[in-house]
């Protein structure tokens, strides 16, 4: 991985994506075939923002494509229908959700959003012929013999080293502390972060402190950490609803260092829960910045905001999964009901990206991390929260 210093040179991907779709709009809407794409993930509870941004991104993009005539795959034109299932961050419900998708004949599913859910649905996906795009980081999901999962975002073990390196070189960070919810997802991210920090030569002053995910008073958890005065406090795998509570507690206890996480966050939730105390909070953002957005991305944000009354920066990343699915199917129409064909196409797949300026392309990556191409390529945007909105700290990439 590397930090990209010139955004004008890097991460400028083609804007041709769905432009041609309007030319395909010939027939009446109702005459198009239907293509169902599934979502199984969390849309309720403390982590709801993660899955909600998925669903809203998919629905906004599907409506837009349908409005412009549908999507041409092979010799057919399809209207896209998004079928959703809230797994409530429960692995058993995630399995039920994936089984529902199989019953409906759906072969391509976005989600789940967390490690437990993504791991639990693997047997169903492999048995029923489903390719799924989790937002979860266990490498065993993406390394052989596994082959049905495609990582839909930048992993914490990819973004963490980049964030720590940047803060070490640019903010003088020398000491670091970690705190995580006592669940497999954040604990795994904490362990990856600790390994990355050690590799960079940072002094780890705390890495065993945990809390229950339903905690609302974080003072007892954070008091011993704040007393150690680390330069950087990492909230490993923190859910969007808990981030402002942790930040507020740390600041009210007198913590003056930097605070970061490798998970995506919601600016509105931070503003409502922590206000100006959240200023300077560093997180992984969506895969877009005002400087690199294409007109198509601006239009997506406009449509999303009009449809739902607000926009979540995380949707800058979540917009990509549906696009990758549809463009890969367009590249090999046989894959529409045969995931083996989809897998064959991934190794050489390349398509214009409608969401950022420039001439780079959508492609599958992951060879370095997984030994096979089982990850979507998106810009790695690292944000700093400031006065109600995210500002770009730096942009990187993963191979």
Positions of the model-derived regions?
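Extracytosolic ligand-binding ectodomains
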Residues: 2-3, 8, 12-15, 29-399
């Amino acid at each position: 991985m590397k930090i990209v210093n010139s955004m004008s040179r890097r991460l400028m991907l083609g804007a041709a994506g769905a432009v041609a779709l309007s030319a395909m709009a010939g027939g009446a809407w109702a005459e198009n075939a239907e293509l169902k794409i599934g979502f199984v993930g969390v849309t309720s509870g403390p982590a709801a923002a993660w899955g909600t941004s998925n669903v809203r991104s998919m629905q906004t993009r599907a409506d837009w494509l349908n409005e412009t005539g549908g999507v041409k795959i092979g010799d057919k034109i399809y209207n896209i229908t998004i079928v959703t299932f809230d797994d409530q961050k429960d692995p058993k419900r995630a399995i039920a959700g994936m089984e529902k998708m199989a019953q409906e004949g759906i072969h391509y599913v976005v989600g789940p959003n967390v490690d437990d859910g993504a791991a639990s649905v693997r047997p169903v996906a492999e048995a029923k012929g489903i390719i799924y795009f989790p937002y979860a980081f266990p490498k065993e999901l993406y390394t052989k013999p596994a082959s049905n999962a495609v990582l839909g975002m930048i992993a914490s073990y990819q973004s963490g080293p980049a964030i720590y390196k940047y803060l070490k070189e640019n903010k003088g960070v020398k000491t670091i502390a970690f705190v995580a919810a006592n669940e497999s997802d954040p604990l795994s991210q904490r362990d990856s972060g600790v390994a990355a920090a050690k590799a960079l030569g940072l002094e780890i002053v705390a890495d065993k402190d945990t809390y229950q995910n339903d905690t609302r008073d974080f003072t007892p958890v954070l008091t011993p950490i704040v007393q150690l005065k680390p330069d950087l406090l990492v909230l490993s795998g923190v859910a969007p609803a808990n981030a402002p509570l942790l930040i507020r507690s740390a600041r009210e206890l007198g913590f003056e260092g930097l605070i970061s996480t490798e998970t995506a966050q919601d600016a509105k939730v931070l503003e409502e829960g922590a206000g100006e105390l959240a200023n300077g909070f560093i997180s992984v953002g969506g895969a877009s910045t005002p400087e690199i957005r294409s007109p198509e991305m601006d239009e997506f944000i406009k449509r999303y905001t009009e449809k739902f009354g607000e926009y979540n920066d995380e949707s800058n990343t979540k917009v990509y999964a549906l696009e990758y699915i549809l463009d890969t199917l367009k590249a090999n129409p046989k894959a529409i009901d045969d995931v083996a064909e989809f897998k064959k196409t991934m190794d050489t797949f390349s398509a214009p990206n409608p969401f950022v300026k420039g001439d780079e392309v959508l492609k599958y990556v992951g060879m370095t991390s997984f030994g096979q191409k089982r990850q979507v390529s998106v810009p790695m945007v690292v944000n700093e929260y400031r006065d109600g909105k995210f500002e770009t700290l730096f942009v990187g990439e993963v191979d």
